[in-house]
Amino acid sequence: MLCLVAAAVEGACDPFPPVASVPIVPTPPPVAATVLVEPAAGAQAILSLISTARLSLWMQMYLLTDDRAISALAERAGAGCDVRVILDPAPYQDAGANQAAFDQLAGAGVDVRWSTSRFSYTHAKTFTVDHARLVVLTLNLTGAGLGGNREYAALDDDPTDVGAAETIFAADLVGAATTVPGGRLVTSPESTRPALLALMGGARVSLALETEELTDPLIVDALLDARARGVAVSLTWPGPTTDAGASFLALAAAGAIVRAATAPPIHGKVVVADDRALYVGSANLTPTSLDDNREMGLRLDQPATAAQVGATVAGDVAGGATP
């Protein structure tokens, strides 16, 4: 009461002081990723990403046989960079395929390890640089991957994506389970199929795909559903035309444009929806890739990038052969 009287007389005491407003800080949009298209970008565009590492380079790689890539990793380790590499122990069911790379890297002081048996294959092809950049590849570091295949490389400097990739890497390095963080990074066996089904299900005008394999029934059904609602579906795979499986033939019968493309050989894995959104990553459209492997990719809402990749797929489709 005394306070109220004093406030009325002198304005010296406010029994109900104003509450300071808390500014609402909007969440910043993700940093736009850049997608390189191979073979046009050239091998050096990929190799130079390794050479830029100064503090750290953490890599998961299905197949590593290219001498230039192995030397670049060894050189970075020799310069004091924290180089860690996870290799699949038997890519293409060949237990010796990565052995030479493993031995050379170990001899150069790289922390190199065989991937965990938690996955059928560690088919991911990714690395982070200096805890600041994530590189998601469709290519293996091989002569073919760096020397003529149709491939894609996504360069992603978004801190959320980089942090998610390094969280997964740290767990995979020791074979531990982890909760996969959210964001644009999608992984198998956790989130690739849901991300792809949502991307395909959201298409209204067009879907353009490049894949080595297409056998997953849910993915095939999503593409057939897209055709049924009038979406233009086009896709390429490596061929030859005589190897077209039931899924490719079913899509062709439903009106999709299906082509076997060999110039350049198709090894990239991309899905482009309406030239506005895309997936780029390591996953083939098979149950093994989606359910059993370690795969990594990015789901991007970037119309300019989607249109760029979509134009590449369209060119490959135009140059392909009908099964």
Over which residues does each language-model region extend?
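Sec-dependent N-terminal signal peptides
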Residues: 1-7
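C-terminal motif of bacterial Sec signal peptides marking the signal peptidase cleavage site
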Residues: 9-12
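Catalytic toxin/effector domains delivered as secreted proteins or via bacterial secretion systems
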Residues: 211
